[in-house]
């Protein structure tokens, strides 16, 4: 995740879903600090600098999935099935990346194995973090037959 979550109500909800998700899988949310003094940077320059920080945080063998508006969309059950397949085929870390406000640098796209989209709608970066961790938790409950998800 590029930049920290600042809204208190989002922080509380995100922390809750992260804790719930950890009952099922090993899960951490790593935050890459927001860039400082970006007013003098173009959107492309900002993406490049964020991209450098993102790539530096990756480890060899990571399977990188970008949360991107042009990525594949899933229904919740389809996403759960996709996550399950990844959990059985990925030997290292499965890393989901939420970029900055302008998206990703070309080098980050090159490092990614897949792109997924949570919606065709646009959400704030604060909100998308919450939506993603809720969907990951929902996927875990679907896979474990917990009564959270209703079709």
Where are the regions that the model predicts?
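Conserved RecA-like P-loop NTPase ATPase core
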Residues: 65, 99, 132
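Catalytic beta-strand/loop module used to bind and position nucleotide/cofactor moieties
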Residues: 68-70, 75-107, 112-123
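Conserved nucleotide-binding/hydrolysis micro-motifs of P-loop NTPases
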Residues: 5-7, 35, 71, 102-103
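Structured adenosyl-cofactor binding patch, chiefly the S-adenosyl-L-methionine
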Residues: 106-150
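S-adenosyl-L-methionine/SAH cofactor-binding core of RNA-modifying enzymes
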Residues: 26-92
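N-terminal beta1-alpha1 ligand-phosphate binding loop
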Residues: 1-21
């Amino acid at each position: 995740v590029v930049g920290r979550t600042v809204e208190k109500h989002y922080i509380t909800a995100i922390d809750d879903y992260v804790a719930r998700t950890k009952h099922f899988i090993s899960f951490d949310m790593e935050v890459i600090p927001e860039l400082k003094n970006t007013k003098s940077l173009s959107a492309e320059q900002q993406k490049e600098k964020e991209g450098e920080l993102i790539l530096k945080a990756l480890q060899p063998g990571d399977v990188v999935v970008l949360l991107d508006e042009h990525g594949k969309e899933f229904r919740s059950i389809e996403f759960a099935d996709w996550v399950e397949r990844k959990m059985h085929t990925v030997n290292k870390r499965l890393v989901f990346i939420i970029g900055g406000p302008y998206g990703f640098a070309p080098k980050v796209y090159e490092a990614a194995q897949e792109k997924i989209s949570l919606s065709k709608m646009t959400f704030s970066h604060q909100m998308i973090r919450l939506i993603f961790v809720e969907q990951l938790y929902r996927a875990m409950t679907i896979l474990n037959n917990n009564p959270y998800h209703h079709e």
